[in-house]
Amino acid sequence: MTDHSHLAAVRDSYDTVATTYAVRVPRPSELDPLNRAMLAGFAELVRAGGNSRVADLGCGPGLVTAHLASLGLDAFGIDLSPSMVGIAREGHPGLRFAEGSMTALDVADDELGGILAWYSTHHTPPEELPRVFAEFHRTLAPGGHVLLGGYIGEDEHLSPAEAYGHPVSYRSYFLPLDRLAELLRGAGLVVAARLEQAASGRAKRPDVCIVARKPERP
């Protein structure tokens, strides 16, 4: 897929599944204890840095955005899908949500204290991830943190015909943990912590959380 076509496939697919997805996706309180702890730890790191402005990239219906706000962060959400953004705005009228792509964020240089990419980068072709992570580096303030959560695999990709009972056209890519960490480092970020969990229960494949930060200026 070209850059344009993969973004269109993700946007159109999530527009199609948005209503069902918003009902079925786990609430933050339903996440496993370690993932909840990673979100809480991320929020604490961001608050300690003195810049609480956080972008939740691929925010979907805004559930995790609202959770970050409840943890004391100035959180806002960005999603490719207009339908997802509409659901997020309706469900969380006190928060800001906007349409956009993590490949070209409408955010100023050094603006953010934190970036959350919570199970939202796996539809990005591997060759596009350096561009995405470069945007993370550009928009983070020095000392700011990224929390990336997602599924991993051995350079696998899937092209499902349907999801959540609806037809979809996106692809999902599952990279090894070490490669994700290497790509983050390649964008100029420092990997500070990694959590890997085996497939179990609702998670049908291994998943990871990676905390990275933008170095302070010398």
Question: Where do the PLM segments sit?
Answer:
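Core SAM-dependent methyltransferase catalytic element
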Residues: 199-218
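Conserved beta-strand signature within the Rossmann-like core of class I S-adenosyl-L-methionine
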Residues: 144-150
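A short acidic, Gly/Pro-enriched loop at the edge of an enzyme's catalytic core
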Residues: 103-115
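A short glycine-rich, Lys/Arg-flanked "PGG" loop and its adjoining helix->strand segment in the class I
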Residues: 130-142
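Short alpha-helix
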Residues: 172-187
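Short, glycine-/aromatic-enriched active-site segment of Class I SAM-dependent methyltransferases
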Residues: 152-171
